[in-house]
Curated annotation (Swiss-Prot):
Superkingdom assignment: Eukaryota
Ranges of the Extracellular topological domain: 45-78, 130-138, 194-205, 304-320, 369-370, 428-435
Membrane topology: Multi-pass membrane protein
Residues in compartment: Cytoplasmic: 1-23, 100-108, 160-172, 227-282, 342-347, 392-406, 457-475
Catalytic activity field: N-acetyl-beta-D-glucosaminyl-(1->4)-1,6-anhydro-N-acetyl-beta-D-muramoyl-L-alanyl-gamma-D-glutamyl-meso-2,6-diaminopimeloyl-D-alanine(out) + n H(+)(out) = N-acetyl-beta-D-glucosaminyl-(1->4)-1,6-anhydro-N-acetyl-beta-D-muramoyl-L-alanyl-gamma-D-glutamyl-meso-2,6-diaminopimeloyl-D-alanine(in) + n H(+)(in); L-alanyl-gamma-D-glutamyl-meso-2,6-diaminopimelate(out) + n H(+)(out) = L-alanyl-gamma-D-glutamyl-meso-2,6-diaminopimelate(in) + n H(+)(in); N-acetyl-D-muramoyl-L-alanyl-D-isoglutamine(out) + n H(+)(out) = N-acetyl-D-muramoyl-L-alanyl-D-isoglutamine(in) + n H(+)(in); 2',3'-cGAMP(out) + n H(+)(out) = 2',3'-cGAMP(in) + n H(+)(in)
PTM section of the record: Glycosylated.
GO MF annotation terms: cyclic-GMP-AMP transmembrane transporter activity; symporter activity; transmembrane transporter activity
Full protein name: Solute carrier family 46 member 2
Matching Pfam families: MFS_1 (PF07690)
GO terms classed as biological process: cyclic-GMP-AMP transmembrane import across plasma membrane; innate immune response; negative regulation of T cell apoptotic process; positive regulation of nucleotide-binding oligomerization domain containing 1 signaling pathway; regulation of T cell differentiation; T cell homeostasis; thymus development; transmembrane transport
Family: Belongs to the major facilitator superfamily. SLC46A family.
Parts of the chain that traverse the membrane: 24-44, 79-99, 109-129, 139-159, 173-193, 206-226, 283-303, 321-341, 348-368, 371-391, 407-427, 436-456
Length: 475
């Protein structure tokens, strides 16, 4: 049988090969990550809770004072931990991206998964041998030296972009995010129950961390032995490019791809001066929008675990797991949002919808007093994942396929660096304001989210419809 399938509207399309699907790697690694994140928070809380009790046994303090002290200790731990997680990949992530582009696409994925596994083993040994929590800084550094999440996710995005056409790329990348969200939801839902399986000071969290190590091991073995690199989707070279549509939708994705514009001009639509190719300012504006928005998201995500442990919410282990799972439902709703909005909106419009969604939810989160209010605020953030994923998709249409690895690594490292600064800043703001207005960090995130709309609006203004099919050029 022929390796290709004929499509009357698009010519020859490559046959689907299940071994090229990166989703199993994403799912298993994310289950491991969600179990690890919940386990890390609960283990650190238990460690500082025990230390706090012993240090103040001789001079009893009010419960509120002890809670504040524990919150500050956990916050200070995460400041250092996030600094290590954010800075350590700088030594290796770009190099792995370059090696992936030059030699083999799986290099960055496999190396970063090895680092994931080693860091999960570090948490397991901390629980098993009752090591001090400072050991986890070393585990995080080891993870970063193997590329960390920056190298892993840029490799995943490169594989997803490589095997998809421009018109399908937004859905392809958001589908990978959907798989990540579903896996994170399942892992978070189970995390609180797994943490409580072995009670007692020495065994608490052992089953949870062991499950995390098992999932990380599966992801590494699958990427090494099963995963294959997909073939690049070639563009038609001698005919007007067909409009790329998404199965089951009425409209089309509006493309930013300069090559399609060149092909259209070659068949009778000559470009006017300055309009042949998108300016570099478009990529720069997309970068700025992604970074400002990521500041808001990372700050909120970093503060939420501390916020839910403190009064007035004061959640237990199971409630913490459920709260983390609620955050992962955003992956599902964002995927559905892309499918619906792509029928009638351009990429820039979808990005702004997501930013408004997150900014509104963060503003509500600042005034949460009850558990049900927390879930309402999270529900308002239902499209919060759309912006960064759609920005990646738009950028991939402006660069050559051979540069996917390097460009995605640069973007991911930029987000990681801003995340390091944001984590430190937000944790310090939280410590200073938790007695006055505990929701101040969420209010700041809301402001930054709406601020990120400005560069995206400029990109949208520079785009003008060229044809009824939705192709766009710049002013």
């Amino acid at each position: 049988m022929s390796p290709e399938v004929t499509c009357p509207r698009r010519g020859h399309l490559p046959r689907f090969h299940p071994r090229t699907w990166v989703e199993p790697v994403v799912a298993s690694s994310q289950v491991a990550a969600s179990l690890y994140d919940a386990g890390l928070l609960l283990v650190v809380k238990a460690s500082y809770g025990t230390g706090g009790s012993s240090n103040h046994s001789a001079s009893p303090s009010p419960r509120g004072a002890l809670e504040d002290q524990q919150q500050r200790a956990i916050s200070n731990f995460y400041i250092i931990y996030n600094l290590v997680v954010g800075l350590s990949p700088l030594l290796s992530a770009y190099g792995l991206g370059w090696l992936s582009d030059r030699y083999h696409r799986k290099i960055s994925i496999c190396m970063s998964l090895l680092g994931f596994l080693l860091s999960r083993l570090g948490l397991l040994l901390k629980v098993l041998l009752d090591w001090p929590v400072e050991v986890l800084y070393g585990a995080a550094a080891l993870n970063g030296l193997f590329g960390g999440f920056s190298a892993f996710w840029s490799g995943v995005m490169a594989l997803g972009s490589l095997g998809s056409s421009e018109g399908r790329r937004s859905v392809r990348l958001i589908l990978i995010d959907l798989m990540l969200g579903l896996a994170g939801f399942c892992g978070s839902m189970a995390s609180g129950h797994l943490f409580k399986q072995m009670a007692g000071h020495s065994g608490q969290g052992l089953i949870l961390t062991a499950c995390s190590v098992s999932c990380a091991s599966f992801a590494l073995l699958y990427s090494l032995l099963v995963l294959k690199v997909p073939e690049s989707v070639a563009k038609p070279s001698q005919e007007l490019p067909a409009v790329d549509t998404v199965s089951g939708t009425v409209g089309t994705y509006r493309t930013l791809d300069p090559d399609q514009l060149d092909q259209q001009y070659a068949v009778g639509h000559p470009p006017s001066p300055g309009k042949a190719k998108p300016h570099k300012t478009t990529i720069a504006l997309l970068f700025v929008g992604a970074i400002i928005y990521d500041l808001a998201v990372v700050g909120t995500v970093d503060v939420i675990p501390l916020f839910v442990l403190r009064e007035p919410l004061g959640w237990n282990q199971v409630q913490v797991g459920y709260g983390m799972a609620a955050g992962y439902t955003i992956f599902i709703t964002s995927f559905l949002g892309v499918l619906v909005f792509s029928r009638c909106f351009r990429d820039t419009t979808m990005i702004m919808i997501g930013m408004v969604s997150f900014g509104s939810g963060a503003l509500l989160l600042a005034f949460v007093k009850e558990t049900y209010m927390f879930y309402i605020a999270r529900a308002v953030m239902l499209f919060a994942l759309i912006p960064v994923t759609t920005i990646r998709s738009a950028m991939s249409k402006l660069i050559k396929g051979s540069s996917y690895g390097k460009v995605f690594v640069i973007l991911q490292l930029s987000l990681a660096l801003t995340g390091v600064v944001t984590s430190t800043l937000y944790n310090k703001i939280y410590q200073l304001t938790m007695d006055m207005f505990v929701g101040s960090c969420f209010a700041l995130s809301s402001f930054l989210s709406f601020l990120a709309i400005i560069p995206i609006s400029i990109v949208a203004y520079k785009q003008v419809p060229l044809s009824p099919y939705g192709d766009i050029i710049e002013k």
